[in-house]
Amino acid sequence: MLTGSLVAIVTPMLEDGSVDFEALDRLVDFHIESGTSGIVAVGTTGESAALAVEEHLQVVAAVVKRAAGRIKVIAGAGANSTHEAIDLTRESRRLGADQVLSVVPYYNKPTQEGMYRHFRAIAESTDIPVILYNVPGRTVADMCNDTVLRLAEIPNIIGLKDATADLARCCDLVKRAPKDFALYTGDDATAMAFMLCGGHGVISVTANVAPRQMAELCRAAIAGDVQAARRINDPLQGLHKDLFCEANPIPVKWALERMGRIPAGIRLPLTRLSDAGQSKVEAALKAANLI
């Protein structure tokens, strides 16, 4: 099982909106050097919704190539069309991704049975390991724990990214899910508590700017070292909050630009971080000793 800090990596772009593959290569190296456990490419933070399918697959291929087996690569492969999600999943496997992250279908608001059949069809279409992704704040459809547990019975559905920030439901899954079913939080602010209650890691936005610290936090929390986890987490609290002061990934892309790691590009309908947001993120970066 893959545990620890998995970065929900941004997709660097030039100011004209084209993907900056050289900057992407540098970010992959940065995470390998910093102890990140895995790279989640073209998810929410990677602006998958703003990429054409061809670009989406080019980013997956680039991350796999640069990783070169040095770090696990999880490819975002979700869609609100089951057929499209199957195609993305198969292509991700062909390109060499180790696992895929598959989001609950958005906009069309499926029932729990619809979610179950959607993910079952994806899993049965290929043998690549699938991580489910529940983020009702974006999809407007919330997959309940009972549905997750039904899906956990399918051999290549291996885990869940829960981005609800609901610790009670996460801890319920820790108690009820198979022991080899990976449970990741998608909420940096509650990640420490989630891992202390038995979660296996975090798919993190904060790790984009603080990969070493997030990797250390995960090691401490998973080991049950509360004091060490708090010591590492406290300076990151501002980032956990203010990297969401506007829609993700607007703040984190600005933060990486401020740190000199990527250019300023972001795609419409997302726009550059506001002046007020820049002040907040700047202060959070300073509090974490990152600038």
UniProtKB/Swiss-Prot annotation:
Pathway: Amino-acid biosynthesis; L-lysine biosynthesis via DAP pathway; (S)-tetrahydrodipicolinate from L-aspartate: step 3/4. One of its GO terms (cellular component) is cytosol. It is an enzyme of class 4 (lyase). GO terms for molecular function: 4-hydroxy-tetrahydrodipicolinate synthase activity. The record marks 44, 107 as: Part of a proton relay during catalysis. The keyword Lyase applies. Pyruvate binds at residues 45, 203. Its main location: cytoplasm. One of its GO terms (biological process) is diaminopimelate biosynthetic process. The active site is at 133 (proton donor/acceptor), 161 (schiff-base intermediate with substrate). Its EC number is 4.3.3.7. It is found in: Cytoplasm. Keywords: Amino-acid biosynthesis, Cytoplasm, Diaminopimelate biosynthesis, Lyase, Lysine biosynthesis, Schiff base. It holds the Pfam family DHDPS. The keyword Cytoplasm applies. It catalyses: L-aspartate 4-semialdehyde + pyruvate = (2S,4S)-4-hydroxy-2,3,4,5-tetrahydrodipicolinate + H2O + H(+). Catalyzes the condensation of (S)-aspartate-beta-semialdehyde [(S)-ASA] and pyruvate to 4-hydroxy-tetrahydrodipicolinate (HTPA). Homotetramer; dimer of dimers. Belongs to the DapA family. This is 4-hydroxy-tetrahydrodipicolinate synthase.
